[in-house]
Design a protein with these regions (language model features):
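Core beta-strand elements of the Rossmann-like FAD/NAD(P) dinucleotide-binding domain
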Residues: 2, 170-177
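N-terminal Rossmann-like FAD-binding beta1-loop-alpha1 element of flavoenzymes
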Residues: 2-28
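Glycine-rich FAD pyrophosphate-binding loop
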Residues: 22-41
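Dinucleotide-binding Rossmann-like beta1-alpha1 core, especially the glycine-rich loop
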Residues: 45-128
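Short beta-strand to alpha-helix junction loop
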Residues: 55-67, 92-93, 128-145, 249-253, ...
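A conserved short coil-to-beta-strand element within the FAD-binding core of flavoproteins
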Residues: 153-167
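Central helical "cap/lid" subdomain
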Residues: 175-217, 247-254, 268-270
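C-terminal catalytic lobe of FAD-dependent flavoproteins
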Residues: 271-372
Length: 372
């Protein structure tokens, strides 16, 4: 019997595994492909806040950015490379958002590095920019290191049954708790109010004689040069899904688009693409992550008829699956949010610490129930 079974071995699942093992718990981790085999493995894994004027997501990402930079540096220093991050506005609206951000942020800002400024295009130099200390994660390595100590099973979870106070997985394994960290792929438990946006990501590694000193974000993300290699990545095709789209993804066209966008920001010389990484990321429809217990929709519709249409529903009145939670929907901020959200989820499961309503999956049940 395991204390927790985690379904999905991307950065979310591996972060939860790490938190549970830190508490001395027995962990089993499932993934049909392998550790960091999907969107997490394809990620550029840039650690960045959200540069916007205001909003719940901006505030959440600010807290997660501060927490995760410290978390990676302390716990996985060999996977974390500190680097200056320079974010450049795309248009006039972005210019204004960055000006407001710079006035209000509590983060320590830096001047744009001189050796970076020399590489920027005329168009990029005209736009507002912001620079601060951030970092880049070795995506696959940190997922492997985080999950070290967990029992890993390369298997698709198709059957999940609650029986005698525990969950039975694929009729073979049992666990007291189950955490669904399935990303953009189908969950073994189907609930109509849980809808995931699948977001295709593409990253390329290139060789170039251009030496980039910083992480640079504008139309795409560019990593600092490392032994002549520079990574370029983006949330590239929001409609493509490898299991649901008939046509295969056009890698060559993806490369062309990434390089075209990158060269709008920076002069890149003698470019040669040496490797491609692709994978699905998952987002929610209100852009905030989903962390917490899953509502049993049919049972809740029957028992909470009178309270389904109130302006501010009380999530505590809903009926939930026993010992079943999820962590999902981080979009392009997976490596920023995962350590922070995994800690929140673990404290909820093991110590009954309340989860903020803004990220609780029950918010989607409340909206769905009203629209039925």
């Amino acid at each position: 019997m395991y204390d927790v079974a985690i379904i999905g071995a991307g950065i979310n699942g591996c972060s939860v595994a790490y938190e549970f093992m830190k508490e001395g718990k027995r962990v089993i981790l499932f993934d049909k492909e392998g550790i960091a085999s999907g969107g997490s493995g394809a990620a550029g894994a840039f650690i960045s806040p959200k540069f916007s004027k205001a909003g719940e997501l901006k505030e959440l990402l600010h807290e997660a950015f501060v927490y995760s930079c410290d978390f990676y540096e302390k716990n996985f220093p060999l996977c974390f490379a500190k680097a200056t991050l320079t974010h450049i506005a795309k248009d006039e609206a972005d210019d204004e958002a960055l000006r407001v951000y710079k006035q209000k942020t509590t983060l320590k800002l830096k001047k744009i590095p001189k050796n970076l400024e020399q590489l920027l295009t005329r168009e990029a130099k005209k736009r507002e920019n912001i620079s601060l200390e951030a970092g880049i994660i070795d995506a696959k390595q940190v997922c492997n290191d985080m999950s070290c100590g967990a029992q890993f099973v390369k298997e698709k979870v198709e059957r999940l049954i609650f029986n005698d106070d525990c969950w039975v997985i694929n009729e073979t394994y049992s666990a007291k708790n189950v955490v669904l960290a399935t990303g953009a792929y189908d969950m073994p438990i189907v609930e109509p109010y849980i809808q995931i946006r699948a977001i295709w990501g593409h990253r390329i590694d290139i060789t170039t004689t251009t030496k980039n000193p910083s992480s640079v974000h504008q139309y795409v993300s560019l990593s600092p040069s490392n032994d002549g290699i520079l990574a370029i990545g983006a949330t590239h095709n929001v409609h493509y899904h490898p299991e649901k789209t008939k046509e295969s993804y056009d890698i060559e066209q993806g490369r062309v688009e990434l390089l075209k966008k990158a060269t709008r920001t920076m002069h890149l010389k003698n470019v040669n693409v040496v490797q491609d990484y692709t994978g699905l990321r998952s987002g929610s429809f209100d852009y905030l992550p989903m962390v917490g217990s899953l509502v049993l929709s049919n049972e809740t519709l029957l028992t909470c008829k009178d309270s389904l249409y109130v302006k501010k529903p009380d999530f505590a009145e809903y009926v939930y699956y026993p010992n079943l939670t999820m962590i999902n929907g981080s979009g392009g901020y997976g490596f920023v949010l995962a350590p922070y959200l995994a800690k929140i989820l673990t404290e909820y499961i093991l110590h009954d610490k309340e989860i903020n309503k803004t990220i609780n999956p029950a918010r989607f049940f409340a909206r769905w129930a009203k629209k039925r």
